[in-house]
Design a protein with these regions (language model features):
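Low-complexity, Lys/Gly-biased intrinsically disordered segments
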Residues: 1-36, 69
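Glutamine-centric residue-chemistry signal
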Residues: 2, 119-121, 127, 131, ...
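Short, solvent-exposed loop/turn positions at domain surfaces
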Residues: 7-8, 52-53, 84, 128, ...
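A short glycine-rich beta-alpha junction/loop motif
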Residues: 8, 13-15, 87-95, 104-107, ...
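A short beta-sheet element
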Residues: 22-23, 39-114
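Short, charged, solvent-exposed linker or helix-capping segments at domain edges/interfaces
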Residues: 32-35, 90, 110, 123-124
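Amphipathic alpha-helical coiled-coil/heptad-repeat segments
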Residues: 141, 145-189
Length: 189
């Protein structure tokens, strides 16, 4: 699979038909999976040339996008593509898009590639001092654990349930912090 080299300046939230998964978003914004139908993802500006990308370069559900560069050990963080229906999506600058040859349960690989078991393999392969990077040739040397499809489904469902609970609790904490700030501003006048 092929990624592109478009910078943030080549992207727009207002214009464009082809979405772009940027490495910075893989590192910071997206979790173990990114729901293309619901996530805010920038598009490649319409005046940029995307004709060189074949249909196999466009991401599909179940594809994995690794961030190949970071300023810390976040390098190699991965996100799994889910919720893709009619959108066209390319993997962007400093990413490594991967398409599994076998069928995996939805979200299993997103969780697995961010697990300690997998990331400990990646850490040994990282290159660089100030900016860390990993290459496709190193990623293909890693080993993955492949339980039965049913077990993959159970693992992904359990972890997703925990993630959903964490998101709800985070929203509650943010609301309480906002309320507290408001009270502190108005109570002691």
């Amino acid at each position: 699979m092929q990624n592109n080299t478009f910078s943030r300046d080549d992207l727009s939230f207002e214009d464009g038909d082809v979405r772009n998964i940027h490495y910075g978003d893989v590192l910071i914004k997206y979790g173990t999976s990114v729901d293309i139908g619901n996530a805010s993802i920038p598009c490649i500006k319409p005046d940029r040339n995307i004709e060189k990308f074949s249909s196999s370069s466009y991401l599909q559900n179940g594809d994995i996008v690794f961030a190949d560069t970071a300023e810390d050990y976040a390098v190699g963080k991965a996100t799994e593509i889910i919720g893709l229906s009619h959108h066209k999506v390319l993997s962007g600058l400093h990413t490594i898009p991967c398409r599994p040859h076998d069928t995996f349960a939805p979200m299993y690989l997103g969780y697995y590639f961010n697990s300690h078991h997998f990331r400990s393999q990646i850490f040994r392969m990282i290159q660089g001092i100030k900016v860390s990077s990993i290459s496709k040739s190193e990623i293909v040397k890693t080993c993955i654990l492949v339980p039965s499809y049913e077990d993959q489904t159970r693992i992904a469902a359990a972890l997703h349930k925990i993630d959903s609970l964490i998101e709800r609790e985070d929203a509650t904490v943010l609301a309480l912090q906002k309320t507290r700030r408001g009270l502190l501003q108005h109570l002691f006048i």
